[in-house]
């Protein structure tokens, strides 16, 4: 983009603002007619007149934009202004129109950025982000390929508005510093008239002599200057008039005709000049007599009296510099004096007055928009909260002025920081609220939509919703789809756009006759359909929603905005190294996940003026357990993350020390210790405001991390440390978020399950899903803890029940306060993309705090939803899976929704003729299973009761491949020795876990090992499993109703005693089955019967025992390596104490697999 650089005798040209043309462009300021009118500054636009009804200011702005051809992209630069009250309307303000009301509003560009045109070399240019510029960052030079801020229609409107503002003195001329400066300003104003008249002539395609006689410079200069000229003598007025005509003619001949200057160039030049000619052009200044700048530890009030006179302060908001404040300066006038001596004295006096007021007149920076987290309005008092917990409070003249002020800051925030967020609910634009609820973007361009799809994986059916850049009544849906081509092997990825039409509040897909009352309803309908276009068919899957501070063409790139762009985490580890000689280890404080916690002292040596001073700093030492040195890298990654942050509510990391085999994280010592313990101790004295302060401080820290795109990964009350109790003081509590410890990416699945419900559900499925969204889930759970005084949610649940809790998409029971419950529910959404941004969380917590809900009396959480209880009416039988003497197992679908989408489960129940003993056995089996959690043990899902609780069914996961006994013969060609040994390792791991919990299985056989996949097996059927008493090494069976004797160890057959070593014997038999592919001719029963001969009843057991005493064992299976058979034989030692262990077997098999 190129702009004109005009050099003229009139030294008045160089900046930006707003203009008018001809008599027709003058806005009628007579008393308004009844009704509501929206006035435009364009000469060819009739005012927008509204009929009876209810409208929002945003609605009217859209209508006005359509009337003036302003694009949806530039529409958010405009707002409605009431010249009578001198107030702007917030976008959500409701206007009720009836016959009695009379209101005139002006449609104006409100949000302005100086040097948007790039013609001022002394100031950084301003542009819209474009896909090309996104990677390059901010450049000091002009960017020829950057996207301009304004479109043609917006520029035209701004030009007309600028003329009006200059003439009507809405944009006041800057104050002259000297008399000569006053003359220069007058010349600049005449130069503006030259530009305006030249533009008018070019638009009308007229030569200067052809212009109407009433087109005079007087109509294009400020009314105050025009009045001043009229008061001068006739000769002076004639001289000004002749000089202006000569200059206009010369400008036309030398510049307009010779340089091929366009009307666009003249508009840009006029507006650029307006920026330097006027005072604070594009800025809004608010006056207050009460101003407070504060942080959590200090306050600075500015509302004192000066000798009985109230001191006023000014707060200025500009697009380029953000929010600034100062004392309101005294007005210093320049008096005209012909006498040179007296004039010099006056100028000296003026300089002295200027120096006196210099300090008062200087603007102090408070904040640029991306720093702001939320804004609160209470009547006429506005509180602006920053990320560093500093706050500005100012009292304005009315609630309406407060809304006007906040809507200004909120609008600039969306233009510079985050296009899809609002800072204050009181001024929330309805369209932004709609977009957030529906995951819809503003009018981002196609390139950004496609880039977003690519960044999120470009899976088929993934889509982006976005408003059209050109039409207010259309939403575009950009979808990833794949076109299969006969010419090209495989499918070609394509991005297709679909148009959604919005008419009279209803939504429909272009080309479809069916419409819906909301965008959400339409999308729900479309997701069930197969969409077709250009020989491509697909189904919609996942919507890519707006993300916090996402870069797009909706954002304006100013110098300050670029400074606040997220700095993404360093790819390399970075932290300060601490020497071991500088650390003194203190007492042991406890254990973390794979770490030991100690108090300690850090010796800090400072060289002050040649003298070395030793300072002792109290610290916490987190020592990685030397047995887990394999995860040292993950430990250092956590330290590196903490090294990148600096926030008052996050614990400070001094550095890392490597001491011999120990890796140590050295952190700030926080006096009050973990928050959960403190809340338990002080639960009786904790108040609602106290809890809200804790929640806000945590949200502030997490919002800071979100802005830096950093993930904590372990947010909970035990990781919140209390630096100040704040129960008896006005300051309140002060908390610090500690380090996350070992990242979940290196934790076992069991360790992840233990962290339910703090860990996000998607991270349980795959720890690689860890993202900022996971911290939002954790925040919701931590908010629950804070509400209930540090109570532990799901504390009585077993691991299997916790896992089921997530599988059933449950949440902890929320408090009775509806708004607080809603916030927790939104944070704990099972769709990570639906969780709110932390800025929105902070805003909502502050809004909720105003209501002061009672969250203290909720002493104990209500009963949790039990996801392990299955209702009988939703169990739909599919087929039988197996049957025994007393029970059976069925395949069922648990389908509470009634749409055949429920999960398939295995249901074990007793036959009707079974007696009370069998019911007790099934209950014992259920109790055992619900306490077991291992990847190689079949999962317990719950129970189903019937007959008033007398009947019971056991619900387990269904593994469709069946048992090894069924699976191996059918898949013999796919299963080699290596895979057989892997199965053996998995069975041993499951049995080793079972033994560690003091259980004996008593029925380990191939028929009871189930196949989850080609690569994983699980131990099932715990009907005979028994618990060994703590003071014994074995379990004695009272009966042998259905004992699998050919898998039993000798002590089981002779004495009915079952040791863990007895399961080892059974494993050896199972391994034999595994290596013979469960061939019926080679089954343990078939082979043992060949050894002992025909027999039946108790004689079978007697002969089997004698055979085993003789040292006879099952033979080596065909093609079984001797090393494997030797491991098998170690399982069959006659004495239990001589047998190998499951741990030794695991090591032996793994050595063979290497």
Curated annotation (Swiss-Prot):
Disulfide bond found in the keyword field: no
Function: Tyrosine kinase of the non-receptor type, involved in the IFN-alpha/beta/gamma signal pathway. Kinase partner for the interleukin (IL)-2 receptor as well as interleukin (IL)-10 receptor. Kinase partner for the type I interferon receptor IFNAR2. In response to interferon-binding to IFNAR1-IFNAR2 heterodimer, phosphorylates and activates its binding partner IFNAR2, creating docking sites for STAT proteins. Directly phosphorylates STAT proteins but also activates STAT signaling through the transactivation of other JAK kinases associated with signaling receptors.
Principal location class: membrane
UniProt cross-references to Pfam families, sorted A to Z: FERM_F1, FERM_F2, Jak1_Phl, PK_Tyr_Ser-Thr, SH2_1
Gene Ontology CC terms: cytoplasm; cytoplasmic side of plasma membrane; cytoskeleton; cytosol; endosome; extrinsic component of cytoplasmic side of plasma membrane; focal adhesion; nucleus
Native source organism of the sequence: Homo sapiens
Entry's EC annotation: 2.7.10.2
Family that this chain belongs to: Belongs to the protein kinase superfamily. Tyr protein kinase family. JAK subfamily.
Name listed for the protein in its UniProt record: Tyrosine-protein kinase JAK1
CDD domains in UniProt: FERM_B-lobe (cd14473), FERM_C_JAK1 (cd13332), PTK_Jak1_rpt1 (cd05077), PTKc_Jak1_rpt2 (cd05079)
Residues involved in ATP binding: 881-889, 908
Active site positions, chain numbering: 1003
Residues annotated as domain Protein kinase: 583-855, 875-1153
Alphabetically ordered keywords of this record: Acetylation, ATP-binding, Disease variant, Kinase, Magnesium, Membrane, Metal-binding, Nucleotide-binding, Phosphoprotein, Repeat, SH2 domain, Transferase, Tyrosine-protein kinase, Ubl conjugation
Positions carrying Phosphotyrosine: 3, 1034-1035
Membrane association type: Peripheral membrane protein
Keyword NADP listed: no
All residue ranges annotated as the FERM domain in the record: 34-420
Broad enzyme group: transferase
Domain SH2: 439-544
Tissues expressing the protein: Expressed at higher levels in primary colon tumors than in normal colon tissue. The expression level in metastatic colon tumors is comparable to the expression level in normal colon tissue.
């Amino acid at each position: 983009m190129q702009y004109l650089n005009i050099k003229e005798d009139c030294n008045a040209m160089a900046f930006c603002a707003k203009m008018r043309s001809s008599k027709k462009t003058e806005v009628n300021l007579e008393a308004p007619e009844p009704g509501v009118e929206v006035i435009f500054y364009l000469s060819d636009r009739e005012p927008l007149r509204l009929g009876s009804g209810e409208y929002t200011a945003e609605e009217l702005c859209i209508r006005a934009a359509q009337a003036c051809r302003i694009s949806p992209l530039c529409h958010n630069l405009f707002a409605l202004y009431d010249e009578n009250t001198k107030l702007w309307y917030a976008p959500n303000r409701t206007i009720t129109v009836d016959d009695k009301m009379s209101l005139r509003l002006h449609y104006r560009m409100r949000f302005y950025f100086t040097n948007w045109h790039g013609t001022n070399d002394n100031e950084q240019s301003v542009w819209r982000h474009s896909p090309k510029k996104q990677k390059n960052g901010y450049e000091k030079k002009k960017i020829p390929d950057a996207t301009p801020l304004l479109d043609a229609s917006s520029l035209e409107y701004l030009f007309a508005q600028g003329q009006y503002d200059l003439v009507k003195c809405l944009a006041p001329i800057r104050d002259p510093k000297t008399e000569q400066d006053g003359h220069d300003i007058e010349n600049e104003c005449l130069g503006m008239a030259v530009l305006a008249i030249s533009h008018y002539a070019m638009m009308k395609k007229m030569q200067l002599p052809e212009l109407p006689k009433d087109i005079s410079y007087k109509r294009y200069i400020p009314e105050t200057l025009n009045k001043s000229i009229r008061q001068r003598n006739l000769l002076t007025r004639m001289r000004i008039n002749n000089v202006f005509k000569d200059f206009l003619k010369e400008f036309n001949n030398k510049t307009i005709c010779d340089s091929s200057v366009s009307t666009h160039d003249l508009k840009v030049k006029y507006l650029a000049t307006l920026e330097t000619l006027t005072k604070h052009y594009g800025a809004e200044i608010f006056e207050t007599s009460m101003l407070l700048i504060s942080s959590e530890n200090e306050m600075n009030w500015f509302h004192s009296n000066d000798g009985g006179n109230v001191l006023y302060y000014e707060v200025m908001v500009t697009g380029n510099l953000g929010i600034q404040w100062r004392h309101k300066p005294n007005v210093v006038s320049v008096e005209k004096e012909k006498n040179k001596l007296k004039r010099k004295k006056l100028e000296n006096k003026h300089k002295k007055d200027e120096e006196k007021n210099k300090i008062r007149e200087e603007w102090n920076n408070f904040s640029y928009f991306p720093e702001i987290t939320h804004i609160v309005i209470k009547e006429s008092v506005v509180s602006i909260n920053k990320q560093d917990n500093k706050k500005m409070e100012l009292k304005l003249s009315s609630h309406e002025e407060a809304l006007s002020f906040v809507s200004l800051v909120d609008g600039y925030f969306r233009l510079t920081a985050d296009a899809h967020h609002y800072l204050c609910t009181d001024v929330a634009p309805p369209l932004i609220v709609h977009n957030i609820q529906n995951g819809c973007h503003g009018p981002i361009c196609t390139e950004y939509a496609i880039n977003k799809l690519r960044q999120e994986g470009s899976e088929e059916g993934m889509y982006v919703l976005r408003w059209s850049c050109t039409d207010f009544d259309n939403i575009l849906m950009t979808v990833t789809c794949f076109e299969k081509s006969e010419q090209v092997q495989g499918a070609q990825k394509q991005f297709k756009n679909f148009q959604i039409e919005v008419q009279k509040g209803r939504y429909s897909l272009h080309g479809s006759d069916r419409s819906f009352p909301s965008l959400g309803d339409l999308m729900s309908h479309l997701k069930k359909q197969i969409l077709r276009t250009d020989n491509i068919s697909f189904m919609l899957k996942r919507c890519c929603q707006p993300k916090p501070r996402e870069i797009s063409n909706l954002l304006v790139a100013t110098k300050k905005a670029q400074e606040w762009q997220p700095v993404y985490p360093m790819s390399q580890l970075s932290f300060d190294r601490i020497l071991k000689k500088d650390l003194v280890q203190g007492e042991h404080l406890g254990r973390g996940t794979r770490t030991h916690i100690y108090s300690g002292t850090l010796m800090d040596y400072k060289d002050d003026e040649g003298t070395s001073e030793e300072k002792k700093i109290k610290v916490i030492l987190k020592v990685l357990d030397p047995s887990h040195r394999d995860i040292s890298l993950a430990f250092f990654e956590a330290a590196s993350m903490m090294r990148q942050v600096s926030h008052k509510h996050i614990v400070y990391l001094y550095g890392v020390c490597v001491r011999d085999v120990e890796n140590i994280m050295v952190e700030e010592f926080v006096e009050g210790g973990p928050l959960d313990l403190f809340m338990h101790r002080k639960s009786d004295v904790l108040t609602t405001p106290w809890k809200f302060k804790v929640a806000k401080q945590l949200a502030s820290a997490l919002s800071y991390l979100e802005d830096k795109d950093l993930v904590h990964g372990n947010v909970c009350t035990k990781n919140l440390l209390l630096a100040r109790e704040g129960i008896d003081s006005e300051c309140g509590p002060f908390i610090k978020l500690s380090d996350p410890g070992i990242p979940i990416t290196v934790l076992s699945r069991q360790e992840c399950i233990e962290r339910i419900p703090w860990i996000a559900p998607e991270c349980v499925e795959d720890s690689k899903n860890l993202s900022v969204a996971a911290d939002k889930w954790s925040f919701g759970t931590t908010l629950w803890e804070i509400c209930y005084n540090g109570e532990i949610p799901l504390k009585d649940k077993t691991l299997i029940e916790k896992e089921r809790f997530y599988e059933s998409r449950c949440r902890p029971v929320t408090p009775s306060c509806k708004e607080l419950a809603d916030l927790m529910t939104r944070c704990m959404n099972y769709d990570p993309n639906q969780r709110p941004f932390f800025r929105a969380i902070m805003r909502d917590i502050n809004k909720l705090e105003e209501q002061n809900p009672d969250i203290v009396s909720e002493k104990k959480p209500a009963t949790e939803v039990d996801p392990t209880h299955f209702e009988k009416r939703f169990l739909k039988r599919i087929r039988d899976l197996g049957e025994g003497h007393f029970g059976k197992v069925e395949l069922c679908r648990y389908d509470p929704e009634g749409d055949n989408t429920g999960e398939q489960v295995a249901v074990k129940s007793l036959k009707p003729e079974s007696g009370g003993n069998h019911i007790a056995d099934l209950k014992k089996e259920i109790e055992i299973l619900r306490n077991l959690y291992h990847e190689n043990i079949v999962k317990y899902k719950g129970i189903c009761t019937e007959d008033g609780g007398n009947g019971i069914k056991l619900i387990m996961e269904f593994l469709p491949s069946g048992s090894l006994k069924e699976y191996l013969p059918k898949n013999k060609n796919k299963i080699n020795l290596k895979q057989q040994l892997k199965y053996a390792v998995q069975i041993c791991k499951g049995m080793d876990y079972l033994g560690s919990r003091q259980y004996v299985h008593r029925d380990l056989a191939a028929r009871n090992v189930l196949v989850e996949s080609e690569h994983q097996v699980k131990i099932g059927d715990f009907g005979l499993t028994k618990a060994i008493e703590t003071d014994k090494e074995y379990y004695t069976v009272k009966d042998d109703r259905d004992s699998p004797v050919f898998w039993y160890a000798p002590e089981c057959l002779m004495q009915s005693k079952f040791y863990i070593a007895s399961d080892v014997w059974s494993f050896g038999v199972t391994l034999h089955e595994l290596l013979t592919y469960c061939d019926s001719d080679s089954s343990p029963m078939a082979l043992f019967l060949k050894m002992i001969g025909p027999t039946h009843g108790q004689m079978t057991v007697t002969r089997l025992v004698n055979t085993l005493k003789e040292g006879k064992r099952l033979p080596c299976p065909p093609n079984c390596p001797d090393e494997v058979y030797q491991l098998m034989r170690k399982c069959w030692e006659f004495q239990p104490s001589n047998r190998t262990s499951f741990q030794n077997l695991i090591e032996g098999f793994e050595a063979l697999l290497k």
